[in-house]
């Protein structure tokens, strides 16, 4: 089973695995990443402000990081990303078995790196899929390469589990790759709706559960009960597993 996951805007330059015996890996799309960095590095600070809608210290730091990209520290992807979903991962408590599961099963989609394995060495960045820095847009820049890569690493009949946000799962070509979507909804007065902050946390908790319990098939997935969420069979179908809970 392979799992796709979203990156986060929040990042840190801290490698929590520095003193562990882990084999770090190289990003698969370094050439394409360098193309994007080259494009960004030619932009003025005013152009970066307009493209990224940033101001003040965040703008200055982002511009500085772009100009000094070569000097930035390499951090494994799973340690670098530090947003809401990633904070639900109990990384420092993971056993050797859990770390191996992460290494073998997780793919983090990204605007700058395409698709990264958990222990690929990356550098911090700021870039969204909707930002216009290439003629055809970032979705088109990445789509073929990411789909070819995922198709190649999936074994025959292996599941691709979608724990990514819609912004990033749109990268996947459903005609080329069969995917099981996981979604989380809150029930209130008989209606169901997705609430962004809850969904982000739930995706992180769900991934954490998969890793710690070495989940490898759909039969195990539909039995998961987590943080009040259960599979909702009325809302789910063979390609979309909807987990719901009552909003108290």
UniProtKB/Swiss-Prot annotation:
BP GO annotations: response to hydroperoxide
GO cellular component: cytosol
Family: Belongs to the UPF0246 family.
Alphabetical list of Pfam families matching this protein: H2O2_YaaD
Domain of life where this protein originates: Bacteria
HAMAP family per record: UPF0246
Protein's name in the database: UPF0246 protein FN1762
